[in-house]
Amino acid sequence: MPEARAVLELVDQCPRQVLRGAFPVIVIEGLDATGKTTVTQAVAGALQAALLKSPPACISQWRQAFDDEPAIIRRAFYSLGNYIVASEIAQASARSPVVVDRYWHSTAAYAIATEVSGAVQHLPPAHHPVYQWPKDLLKPDLVVLLTVSPEERLRRIRGRGLERTSEEEELEANSVFRQKVEVSYAWMESPGCHVVDASPSRERVLQAVLSLIRDRCPQLP
């Protein structure tokens, strides 16, 4: 698969050990249609922060090809993307705050929900190592998780009419899969996710996120 070779070559170009800069790193997570991308862009603008995303732009052209592959190959693509993003975060955080549109938590939550068959009770228990941040991956200062009710998510998705990944379609069609993703997010540790209700207006959600960031990252101006 030529796309896999290209991704691996990019990973090989990343330094083995990345040292982050002095500025804070904030990750914003959320299921599809929670307003995550819009909020992420607004937060980056308000903080005059660098805006990054996972998977990063340098491999995003191959995302569709990997989304059509079996789960194990798809997960490898997103996992490797996180390590490429970590290298970008390290460089950017030396110059300004960094806001990241998805990172390791989403990769892990979707992987766990996909690999664990059956209902939510079959998930690994809370505090299981699978919910722990990888020791070799650059860690953010704060992870914000945007949430809306299943009914509101469905209304927004159907109103957008945008192309979705197979996993996003699964979220809409399969409430058990969605619940497993949500519980996996809730059980992430070191760092855990700080939940923000994304149901109100965009401006109210933005202010709630900025308030949380300034509370948790006092080094911001």
Which sequence ranges carry the predicted segments?
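NTP-dependent small-molecule kinase module
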Residues: 1-19, 151-221
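Walker A (P-loop) ATP-phosphate-binding motif of ABC ATPase nucleotide-binding domains
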Residues: 25
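Hydrophobic anchor at the beta1->P-loop junction of P-loop NTPases
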Residues: 28
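P-loop (Walker A) phosphate-binding loop of NTP-binding proteins
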Residues: 31
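Conserved lysine of the Walker
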Residues: 36
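Hydrophobic positions on the alpha1 helix immediately C-terminal to the Walker A/P-loop
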Residues: 39
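ATP-dependent small-molecule kinase phosphotransfer cores
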Residues: 46-134
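A glycine- and Lys/Arg-enriched "phosphate-lid" helix/loop adjacent to the NTP-binding pocket
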Residues: 107-183
